[in-house]
């Protein structure tokens, strides 16, 4: 009898274990089919709206949002590719998608939605090879807090070069391109519009007026909205969404701006490729495009018909002559020197902000005195100081050399982060060059002041 009971108990245990295993497999399969994992650099104000609306339209589906900076998202997808659990990569910077495409980390997808033109401005909305899709357009420009500007007597800027003026000293904020894909596009836009040498000179003259280089891209609109600083160099939706939220903010596109699509792509070997495609279709649908006009989002739709529902004064890249004449952005050039440009910005600006700002302040003060008391020798010293700040440790030809650009593989999040090998050697030489020039520029400007 005891043997029979024991036998039945073992049989029952085996059946229970088998049932649990089958249940686990079933639940796992259900989770794979009904969970969509998205790596994105976009802020919660945007992702929350799309998550809620997509889940509402697809009951039982869960969107898992993994928030990462663009460069960190690229790194994550590369490092997890052998056991990929990500379905979609969703970010602004098209050159980031080119990096993933070149590493065979994106899957092709054919969009079914109609009504999306081939181009916005001069730039293709979708990747011509089919690996990623544009869902919104983006331009780059300047936002400012009107209340702050009135209190500090700051004029309204109309061009990048306006931010070089002494009146803006310590009133400007920007993120670093190594920390933000959209900021990288802004820097590249200026470099491509003005040329390598003149573009960096513009960038450094503006940076000399920075109050802050923020750790994250959204730190710039936060700083402007809160009045921590008055002016921010941003992607357009930061300025437009701040307006939508009721902040006293204005935004303009300078004449030298680029108009490029913000994108989404299916990751190669996505666990839920079918649902990933459905999310792309949702973004490009009438409903998805209208969501871009939400006051907390305020991005430029890629479907021209959506602008009929846009608020008054909302930019329209399909009929705004200023935006249609935007710079033809060279994506291949940007991608080829992506890490190099980021490293150069950090060495010359991010990590030497105090040195650059001190030299800039000395020049501003000397020029103010020179305006009152003209002096040829003092003017010569001031011009020499300006030239020293503008000097670059690398030529455009070197920057565009693919072998040299390939040296830059590691991104430094902060000055204390260590790089090794050839990249470390090059950055150390750059740093020595930059510090010497900034210090000498400050010294010459102070000498000029002594003559006035």
Residue ranges and their predicted role:
Residues 143-148, 259-273, 291-292:
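A bilobed periplasmic-binding-protein/Venus flytrap-type ligand-binding module shared by bacterial periplasmic
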